């Protein structure tokens, strides 16, 4: 289901824009679709034809996503394993301070070497309704005032659906435009489309290195955009929305934590409307990467910050509960496959 399908269905039942808006807002808040207001009951507002169909519509919306399991973290986050109607699984993460990280694809085609999600490749796109449904689900647990498209998938590879979801969340969803964050490895279509939108979200760009050849190895299927060019594109968007770009940098010991990288960061970030997020690597099973030790990370932050680069350390939420993107899903899929194998042997 796409969000447009819901609107068209309600309109066909005789719902006016104000009716559709109220029903949509109730869904986005994780409330029953027939929720009224303090001053007006549903039966005095919605047409009878719409009210009669609401139970069936609610059942379809509830079927979009289902909580498979919840995994609270020591940092106040909670990782949600979410099952879709076709039994595929994605991850959402409730973040401290009323944030929610959602997925835009099942799997991912970019194939970042340090990311579990990319190891499965792209399995399918999420519809705009499936993305918004993750927000509705999250709001059943706690308030959600910020939504970041940083879960499984590359939003630029599902651009129409992601932009449709962002538009609804930034209007009927009641989320401030700067509290909607579009995260991408960098794609020319993103820089063309985002400035044209009614809701223009904040932007996070996966940089990870200042070395173009190294970036190609780390992000093998990302568009071939030189880091310097990527930052120029980001800068233009930052100035247009008057909000800084977040540049993501997954810290890999001995790979992108050198003094040369830091000096290049100083050069590229000079005068930029930007924030650098250093993300210590979250180890996967049987991989070849490690995070730098804590002392080295502190040195990097102090060096960059003291020279004018606003630098923050962002640990993956819920590191104690398979915190790296895609790890929870990978373990669940492995358990399902193992169970099927055992059954086939009996």
From Swiss-Prot:
**Which GO molecular function, any one, fits this protein according to its record?**
RNA methyltransferase activity
Compartments where found: Cytoplasm
Q: How many cofactor units bind, and how?
A: Binds 1 [4Fe-4S] cluster. The cluster is coordinated with 3 cysteines and an exchangeable S-adenosyl-L-methionine.
Using the chain's own numbering, where are the disulfide bonds? 101-325
The catalytic site is made up of 91, 325
Stretches assigned to coiled coil: none
Which InterPro entries does the UniProt entry name for this protein?
Aldolase_TIM, Methyltransferase_A, rRNA_lsu_MTrfase_RlmN/Cfr, rSAM
Q: Which GO terms describe its biological process?
A: rRNA base methylation; tRNA methylation
Residues given in the record as S-adenosyl-L-methionine binding sites = 153-154, 183, 206-208, 282
Would you tell me the Gene Ontology cellular component terms?
A: cytoplasm
Which EC number(s) does the record attach to this protein?
Answer: 2.1.1.-
Q: Which family does it belong to?
A: Belongs to the radical SAM superfamily. RlmN family.
Q: What is this protein called?
A: Probable RNA methyltransferase Pmen_2155
What is the protein's species of origin? Ectopseudomonas mendocina (strain ymp) (Pseudomonas mendocina)
């Amino acid at each position: 289901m796409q969000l447009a399908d819901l609107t068209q269905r309600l309109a066909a039942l005789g719902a006016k824009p104000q009716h559709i808006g109220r029903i949509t807002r109730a869904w986005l808040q994780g409330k029953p679709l027939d929720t009224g207001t303090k001053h007006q009951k549903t039966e005095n507002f919605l047409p009878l034809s719409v009210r009669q169909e609401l139970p069936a519509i609610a059942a379809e919306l509830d079927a979009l996503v289902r909580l498979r399991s919840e995994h609270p973290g020591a940092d106040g986050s909670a990782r949600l394993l979410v099952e879709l109607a076709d039994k595929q699984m994605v991850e959402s993460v409730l973040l401290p301070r009323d944030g929610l990280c959602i997925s835009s694809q099942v799997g991912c085609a970019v194939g970042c070497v340090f990311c579990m999600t990319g190891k499965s490749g792209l399995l399918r796109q999420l519809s705009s309704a499936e993305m918004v449904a993750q927000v509705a689900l999250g709001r059943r647990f706690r308030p959600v005032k910020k939504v970041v498209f940083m879960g499984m998938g590359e939003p630029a590879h599902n651009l129409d659906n992601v932009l449709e979801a962002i538009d609804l969340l930034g209007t009927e969803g009641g989320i401030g435009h700067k509290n909607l964050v579009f995260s991408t490895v960098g794609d020319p279509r993103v820089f063309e489309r985002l400035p044209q939108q009614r809701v223009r979200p904040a932007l996070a760009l996966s940089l990870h290195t200042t070395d173009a050849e190294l970036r190609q190895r780390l992000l093998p299927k990302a568009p071939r955009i030189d880091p310097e060019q990527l930052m120029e594109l980001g800068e233009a968007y930052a100035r247009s929305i008057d909000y800084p770009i977040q540049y993501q940098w997954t810290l890999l010991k001995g790979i992108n934590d050198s003094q040369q990288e830091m000096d290049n960061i100083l050069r590229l970030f000079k005068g930029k409307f930007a924030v650098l997020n250093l993300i210590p690597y979250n180890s996967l099973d049987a991989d070849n990467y490690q995070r730098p030790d804590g002392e080295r990370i502190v040195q990097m932050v102090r060096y960059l910050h003291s020279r004018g680069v606003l630098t923050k350390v962002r640990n993956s939420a819920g590191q104690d509960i398979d915190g790296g993107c895609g790890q929870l899903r990978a373990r669940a899929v492995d358990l399902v496959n193992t169970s099927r194998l055992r059954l086939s042997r009996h």
